[in-house]
Amino acid sequence: MVESDEDFAPQEFPHTDTDVIVNEHRDENDGYASDEVGGTLSRRASSIFSINTTPLAPPNATDIQKFTSDEHHFSMMRNLHMADYITMLNGFSGFYSIVSCLRFTLTGKPHYVQRAHFFILLGMCFDFLDGRVARLRNRSSLMGQELDSLADLVSFGVAPAAIAFAIGFQTTFDVMILSFFVLCGLARLARFNVTVAQLPKDSSTGKSKYFEGLPMPTTLALVLGMAYCVRKGLIFDNIPFGIFREDQILEFHPIILVFFIHGCGMISKSLKIPKP
């Protein structure tokens, strides 16, 4: 049977409050404007990093059908956009930072942990760049939001925790705090994916009025602090404030509580940071 163009025409579906928003290339640094036609959400209406405030149209039903029905080898890679590949470079940077921490642990050579800090900074650059590329190319992405969140978890959650462990935060209690920190980042990103459409928007720009909890990239402050400690030799036995209850079951480094506080800040709903 010959298929007509009508067979692949986009279909309109009634919109309800529980509809899942079409996946767009966005991250937690962005704001969004509601597209009243069809009740969907246009991608990247405005953010402090946006080139302009003009929203892009989300992928339509034809894009979704093409993405899900293509069963050829490497079809997923062919359907990714340039912005998606830049997001994956963010994930690569985070993973390479973790590998550099492992090399530092095995060899003790400080340039490896310095490299770990550098690759987290590089991941931050990719995190800001992916949305700009999507806007310049006027292309929305089906998997952009999920890729962004997963890459951010690796680069700004797991990698900083790996650096902390590598430079001396290695007691059982230290590791529990670092695990809590990573899980808070995971929960924060999951909450963002679910609630971003419900956050109050500025009526003139469509931009979210505030961050709910600390954004994941703010962990860069912890990374810079650890980079300073490495540069000054304040690692292992020289970690500031020493170790509490040394050689006991609950021994820990008091400064590790900074990770605990930051983790609590990421999952806080009462902490609302106004966007500029």
Swiss-Prot record:
Its EC number is 2.7.8.8. Residues 1-21 are annotated as: Disordered. Signal peptide: none annotated. The keyword Transmembrane helix applies. PROSITE patterns: CDP_ALCOHOL_P_TRANSF. Divalent metal cations; Mn(2+) or Mg(2+). Optimum pH is 8. Its main location: membrane. It is found in: Microsome membrane; Endoplasmic reticulum membrane; Mitochondrion outer membrane. It is a multi-pass membrane protein. This is CDP-diacylglycerol--serine O-phosphatidyltransferase. The lineage of its organism: Eukaryota, Fungi, Dikarya, Ascomycota, Saccharomycotina.
